[in-house]
From Swiss-Prot:
Transmembrane segments: 20-40, 49-69, 87-107
CC per GO annotation: plasma membrane
Catalytic activity: fumarate(in) + L-aspartate(out) = fumarate(out) + L-aspartate(in); fumarate(in) + succinate(out) = fumarate(out) + succinate(in); (S)-malate(in) + succinate(out) = (S)-malate(out) + succinate(in); L-aspartate(in) + succinate(out) = L-aspartate(out) + succinate(in)
Protein name in UniProt: C4-dicarboxylate transporter DcuA
Record's keyword terms, sorted: Antiport, Cell inner membrane, Cell membrane, Membrane, Transmembrane, Transmembrane helix, Transport
Entry similarity comment: Belongs to the DcuA/DcuB transporter (TC 2.A.13.1) family.
Topological relation to the membrane, as annotated: Multi-pass membrane protein
Source species: Serratia marcescens
UniProt cross-references to Pfam families, sorted A to Z: DcuA_DcuB
Function description: Responsible for the transport of C4-dicarboxylates during aerobic and anaerobic growth. Required for the uptake of L-aspartate as a nitrogen source during aerobic growth. The uptake of L-aspartate in aerobic conditions is coupled to the excretion of fumarate, resulting in the net uptake of nitrogen without carbon uptake. In addition, during anaerobic growth, catalyzes the uptake of fumarate, malate or aspartate coupled to the export of succinate. May play a a general role in anaerobic C4-dicarboxylate transport.
Superkingdom of the organism of origin: Bacteria
One example GO MF annotation: antiporter activity
Length: 132
């Protein structure tokens, strides 16, 4: 029985990875449904955690549509290009504040290409500002 459950979970993960975006959530729901159909008893639903995650996703989606993420990345680029010598110190600080302002660390992924580009222009290995 454990092998069947493992196969269902892995198939749901694979399907979600192939679909991407909102499909990840649908694949997870499909996996839970399949597990319930074979008799696995679901546990208590953590509504508090789900509500927090949904609120953060809704907020970041609204910010993306309104252009807020683009604005924050533009401000990041301005700051890093004005102070390129200090990129090793500024890059982690900027990504920290992006995470605080957006409520999720996913916005930091938008700033990584900017950080890498400015570092390369200064002759600094991009791994230094990206890893600190």
């Amino acid at each position: 029985m454990l092998a069947v459950e493992l196969v269902i979970v892995l198939l749901a993960i694979f399907l979600g990875a192939r679909l991407g975006g909102i499909g990840i959530g649908f694949a997870g729901g499909l996996g839970v449904l399949a597990l319930a159909l074979i008799g696995v008893k679901p546990g208590n639903i953590p509504f508090d955690v789900i509500s927090i995650i949904m609120a953060v996703i809704a907020a970041i989606s609204a910010m993306q549509v309104a252009g807020g993420m683009d604005y924050l990345v533009q401000q990041t680029e301005k700051l890093l290009r004005k102070n390129p010598k200090h990129i090793t110190i500024l890059a982690p600080i900027v990504t920290y504040f992006l995470t605080i302002f957006a409520g999720t660390g996913n916005i930091s992924l938008s700033a990584l290409p900017v950080i890498a580009e400015v570092a390369k222009e200064q002759g600094i290995k991009p791994c230094r500002p990206l890893s600190t």
